[in-house]
């Protein structure tokens, strides 16, 4: 199969998959695997090659990004459980000030959601939003929209969250995550600007229950602080995120400048995503020790793996679909037509 028929078949397959997940409540993993198998047969991939295509697509994702996703999730869990994420949020509030609470919430969400899953980030930061709402009397809706926008922007664009890592692996740039981080941060800027103005716009037109029925929301924030006891210092709160980024930047710099010798080898070693995030995890473990929560590290790891497991399998199933699409010649067809259009 080739040409327009290939594109139409692909569109129909994606539509069926979306319906299967959203309407028929089929597990995303099974939906992706099933559609991949059916698509492989329909587009004419030789039957003898289909098992190998599925296997290579699945294992390729695990080999390129699986460990990176696990390490990033572990770092995020540690930041959440030690209060480091809360410390990061407080640092942002001090930087921005309380006169623009919606901007503070947006930046907080953007920073915290880099290592922490966006849903957990919302749980962590929502008490701060409520506390700022009580102090500033600013629109609760505007602050919530800004927070959500910040959380989702970095979650979608910036590693080590699974989505951008998976995209990097599919595009063959999984070993250059620093570039993905930089490009994701750049793309985030216009997104955050638009979201900021939209939050202000919608906040003037809609009132939430928080504003209609005021309650003692600041108490939740105080209780949250008490549950952590003393928050980590600023350096240790940011180190598990910042150190891996610096390591990956060093590795990219070594490649770009053509370094050679032992220094280049060492720079590229610590700059590889797996090693860089392992170093970040080591700083996270030190943070756990300082917080007196080292004994709970095993439980944290187990809980994190339970959360990450389904994400890994769904991501790997997406890799299978990508491999089927590539093997069917869809990518080559798009390249040929793009080249023809450019001429």
What positions do the PLM features span?
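Membrane-helix interface motif
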Residues: 158-167, 250-260, 328
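Membrane-helix interface "capping/anchor" motifs
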Residues: 19-30, 134-142
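Structural signature of hydrophobic alpha-helical transmembrane segments
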Residues: 1-10, 62-68, 120-121, 188, ...
């Amino acid at each position: 199969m080739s040409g327009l028929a290939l594109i139409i078949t692909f569109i129909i397959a994606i539509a069926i998959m979306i319906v299967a997940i959203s309407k028929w409540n089929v597990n995303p993993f099974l939906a992706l695997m099933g559609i991949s198998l059916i698509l492989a047969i329909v587009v004419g991939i030789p039957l003898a090659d289909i098992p190998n295509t599925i296997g290579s697509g699945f294992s390729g994702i695990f080999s390129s990004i699986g460990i990176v996703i696990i390490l990033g999730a572990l770092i995020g869990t540690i930041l959440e459980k030690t209060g480091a994420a809360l410390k990061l949020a407080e640092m942002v509030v001090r930087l921005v000030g309380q006169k623009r609470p919606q901007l503070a919430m947006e930046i907080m969400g953007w920073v915290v959601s880099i290592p922490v899953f966006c849903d957990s980030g919302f749980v962590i930061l929502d008490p701060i939003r409520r506390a700022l709402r009580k102090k500033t009397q600013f629109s609760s809706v505007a602050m919530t929209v800004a927070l959500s926008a910040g959380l989702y922007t970095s979650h979608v664009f910036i590693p080590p969250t699974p989505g951008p890592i998976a995209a990097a692996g599919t595009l063959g740039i999984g070993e250059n995550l620093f570039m993905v981080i930089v490009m994701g941060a750049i793309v985030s800027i216009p997104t955050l600007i638009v979201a900021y103005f939209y939050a202000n716009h919608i906040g003037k037109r809609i009132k939430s229950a928080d504003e209609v029925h005021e309650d003692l929301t600041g108490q939740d924030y105080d209780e949250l602080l008490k549950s952590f006891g003393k928050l980590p210092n600023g350096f240790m709160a940011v180190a598990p995120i910042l150190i891996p980024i610096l390591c990956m930047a060093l590795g990219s710099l070594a490649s770009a400048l053509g370094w050679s010798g032992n220094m280049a080898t060492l720079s590229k070693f610590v700059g590889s995503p797996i090693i860089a995030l392992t170093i970040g995890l080591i700083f996270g473990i030190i943070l756990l020790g300082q917080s007196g929560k080292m004994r709970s590290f095993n439980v944290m790891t187990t809980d994190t793996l339970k959360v990450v497991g389904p994400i890994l399998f769904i991501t790997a199933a997406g890799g299978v679909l990508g491999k089927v699409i590539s093997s069917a010649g869809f990518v080559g067809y798009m390249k040929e037509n793009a080249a023809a259009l450019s001429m």
